[in-house]
Each structure stands twice: as structure tokens, then as C-alpha cells.
């Protein structure tokens, strides 16, 4: 964490699961200050009390700013003196965005542009924008707006060399706020069947710690305009559900309710076109931005016509985890171990 020594980090949407994971991982380092920017004063107050209780010696490093990425003035107010930004603020619930697509546009697209414009004006050194696998071949409003968020970031990156701007794409972050596992655990506790959409549906899976690792990797190794992804494994929804049931109550019934608005049978982290230019970096892929300008005439003679033919990287052709492998992964997640310790079978 030497790159963060004495630095000020701003996290938009900072009271969410990602922000909590960053605070847990960064507060005990030599970072100077972490600013939490979000709309919900109650969540900020809860977070303040939580970290004062569990990390009293370093909790003063956290500074809270109430605001909305839709309001550029509130964004600028939080950004004075900031070195780095992790931009996590978003509307991310797929069905909700289907019913309120313009709200998703205002937060995910226009809000991102506000953050980037203010960051460039304030001389911020690096901005990492958190995106999603739903931005690749998007079929729903949330994915479409996150795809546009990436385009906004890449367009901004083309026009600045003082602020490095990168995007990271995630699959499903296990046990994050609003995700399915906390719902299933509550259903099991209540003695009800757990509800799944479609058993054969596949999803990439990663932990919150892996989500933070991806952002830090992008921060350290990404270049301006890059999209970075982790080579994440995947599993079927049925496999994930069986793993949760076996951990908490193997007698729990699994009830299929059908696909919700805007959902896909599988997700894609890199498209065919992106795979053709992707750089293999071990556990990660880096997709460099297309740095060409709009004057295509000069590329008729000078352009590179050779492209490697590759298939997309999606949740059907990555490693598919078994029930036992998913259980092992779940048992590394504090949310699960805490829930199990409080569980009375």
C-alpha cells in the first residue's frame, strides 16, 4: 500500500459493501485520509459508529461527505485535495433500473461524467470506475448505462494525461448489499423455501476482497482508458443455492420463480472484440483503449489489420465451480462465517 502512503482517497457510494471492504482493508495502513461520499446520512452515521467501535485508533482517518454524484457541486465540495478516487456510486438493481431507466442514466452515466469532470478539474491523479459484466453485450437498462459509463470514462481519458482513468468490470460479488445470498439466508432462517430464478443460469462469482484487489490492481497496473477484469470462476444459480443450503440447512426446499426483468442466462466479462486486443496479465485481463482519432483516412494505409480471433470470456466458458468449491469459497467470507456462528439449526 506504499502508493497510498499519506494520500487522500475518495470513495463515491462509499457506504456500500465495496466501501466497507476498502475501509476494512485500508484503515490500518499508512493511508492519510479516506473520504466517504454518499447520499444516505443514516448509513454514514451507522458506518461512523461501527468503525469508531472496531477501529478506534484509526477511525479519525474517515471523513464523511453527504452529496449525490448527480450534483456536481456536491462532488466538487468533496474533491478538494483528493489524490485518488474509487467511483462506486451506482444504481445496480437490474429490475429497478428496467422500471426507472432515466434514474439509472442520471446516476450511472451523468453522475460518472460529473465525477470525472470534477476530478480532472481538481487535478486528481487517478480515478477507478467500478463497472459490471452486464456492460458487455448489455440487454437491460442497468447494463446499458454501465456500458455508457465505460464509454464516458474512455472518452474522458482520451482528453487528459494528468488524470489516469480506468474501469474495472465485476461479476457477482458474493454477499454484497442487495445480492441474493443474504436474501436466501433470511429465507432459510424463516423456514421458507429459497427462491431462485433459473437453475441453469450462470454467473461469475467473486468475494468483496477480490473486488478490492481488482481495483488496486487497476490502480497499480492500468493505463489511461483501460478496462480491467479478473479471470473469475463461475457457477450455476442452482449450484450456488445448493451450497448455501448445505451450509445452513440441507433440508431447505429450492423454489424456481423464473427469470426477472432484464436478466440474461449468462454474463460476459470480455466481448469477442475486446478479447482480440486484451493483454493477459496473469490473474487479470487488461483491455487497452482504442486511441485512434476520428480521422480514419490515415488508418487506411497505416492501420493494423491483424486481429487475433478469440471467443468471448463469459460465465459458460470459464471455470465452473462445483457445490463443494462454492462452499469452500463461501466459508472464506466473513458475512457467511458470522451468519453461521449465529445460526441455530
Region spans (language model):
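Rossmann-fold scaffold of SDR-type NAD(P)-dependent oxidoreductases
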Residues: 12, 79-88, 129
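Conserved glycine-rich Rossmann-like NAD(P)H-binding loop of the short-chain dehydrogenase/reductase
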Residues: 30-43
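Strand-loop microenvironment adjacent to phosphate/nucleotide-handling motifs in alpha/beta enzyme folds
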Residues: 151, 155-172, 177-345
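Hydrophobic/aromatic anchor residues within beta-strands of the central parallel beta-sheet
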Residues: 64, 104, 165-168
